[in-house]
Amino acid sequence: NPTKKKRFNADTIEELKRKESGSSEDIIEMHIKNSKDSMLTVAELAKITALSLDEVKQDVDALEEKGIIKVFHMKKDSYTWHRDNGKMLQEEMIKTLQIYHEKHLYRYGMQKAEIHMTFMRKVKPNVFDLYMESLVGEGVMKRRNEFLSLPQHEIVKDRIYQQVESKLLTTFEKAGLDFPKVSEIDFGTVPFEVVEDILLLLMEEKKIIKLGEELYTLTSYIEKSRDYLFYVKRKRFDYHGGNSRCFGNKQEER
């Protein structure tokens, strides 16, 4: 059944005017534009407008070709998004990311899931991913793993960064296999949140490895330990294997 419309509703009046003009394409565009926090599917548009799926698909294709909307194709349906809504959303995301980058100097960006829940929670995650990929392709966003940032954002390894990095690497190097807790290391006036951010970056760069809750060490130590264990295991294998061959030879001689 068609959605019940309130009298004098602005969107309803606009729809009636467009219906009078006889342009189904205009009506489709209007509904897509009015859906500012979600993406209407072709099936939903057909239900709203009482048009056939084929008619809606034709209008959607025409709107996409004109650059008025974006269409994200999934297996079961196609999702539509108006360029005007996209511009407004991009402006909001850019402002949010600018503030975020200023506050968190040592992070690659906001987590993709956080941006999804903040701006487009009504959009399915896989459709949201397609939209973010399109923004990355257009140079609006930059992505690194599960982090999204502004294209120009780069982590500056300034004095504070170098101070924390040096403290962490030196402490873990001296500790060997004692695995000191990061929370027990003295970083002076540097906030612990900043220390955690730099620690995550060092893990990303494979300089430090996490072993457990608050347990970290140098990646080089783990690699050396792994090489040593492999060496010992190989020596034991060669020793026992050699003895077996010797015993086998003696038995053969008998």
Tell me the role of every PLM-derived stretch.
Residues 1-210, 218-254:
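C-terminal effector modules of nucleic-acid-centric enzymes and ribosome-associated factors
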